[in-house]
Amino acid sequence: MASNAAVPFWRAAGMTYISYSNICANIVRNCLKEPHKAEALTREKVHFSLSKWADGKPQKPVLRSDTPEV
């Protein structure tokens, strides 16, 4: 039997664990001094490929990134 007293504080605040861990990671990165801060910010970038499927076959993949296009 689970008790409400054992609920993690991030869940009690209405957050998911992923959003909580992202906030914690941002706080840690902001506390770093240079050059470690610049290195951490470059590792933060995410790139991924997205393919739509039609008739059971993947279409041409589209490369996406979380960084804004310049």
Swiss-Prot record:
Query: Is Mitochondrion one of the keywords UniProt gives this record?
Result: yes
N-acetylalanine modification sites? 2
Q: Which SUPFAM superfamilies does the record associate with it? A: Epsilon subunit of mitochondrial F1F0-ATP synthase
Q: Which InterPro entries match?
A: ATP_synth_F1_esu_mt (IPR006721), ATP_synth_F1_esu_sf_mt (IPR036742)
**UniProt KW Transport keyword:** yes
Q: Which UniProt keywords are given for this protein, alphabetically ordered?
A: Acetylation, ATP synthesis, CF(1), Hydrogen ion transport, Ion transport, Membrane, Mitochondrion, Mitochondrion inner membrane, Transport
Q: Where's it found, cell-wise?
A: Mitochondrion; Mitochondrion inner membrane
Its domain of life reads Eukaryota
**Any one Gene Ontology molecular-function term assigned to this protein's record:** proton-transporting ATP synthase activity, rotational mechanism
Please provide one cellular component term from the Gene Ontology annotations of this protein: proton-transporting ATP synthase complex
Q: Which PANTHER family match?
A: ATP SYNTHASE EPSILON CHAIN, MITOCHONDRIAL, ATP SYNTHASE SUBUNIT EPSILON, MITOCHONDRIAL
The record describes the protein's role as: Mitochondrial membrane ATP synthase (F(1)F(0) ATP synthase or Complex V) produces ATP from ADP in the presence of a proton gradient across the membrane which is generated by electron transport complexes of the respiratory chain. F-type ATPases consist of two structural domains, F(1) - containing the extramembraneous catalytic core, and F(0) - containing the membrane proton channel, linked together by a central stalk and a peripheral stalk. During catalysis, ATP synthesis in the catalytic domain of F(1) is coupled via a rotary mechanism of the central stalk subunits to proton translocation.
Subunit? F-type ATPases have 2 components, CF(1) - the catalytic core - and CF(0) - the membrane proton channel. CF(1) has five subunits: alpha(3), beta(3), gamma(1), delta(1), epsilon(1). CF(0) has three main subunits: a, b and c.
Family membership, please give it. Belongs to the eukaryotic ATPase epsilon family.
> What is the protein name stated in its UniProt record?
ATP synthase subunit epsilon, mitochondrial
- Which species does the entry assign this protein to? Arabidopsis thaliana (Mouse-ear cress)
Query: What does UniProt list as this organism's lineage?
Result: Eukaryota, Viridiplantae, Streptophyta, Embryophyta, Tracheophyta
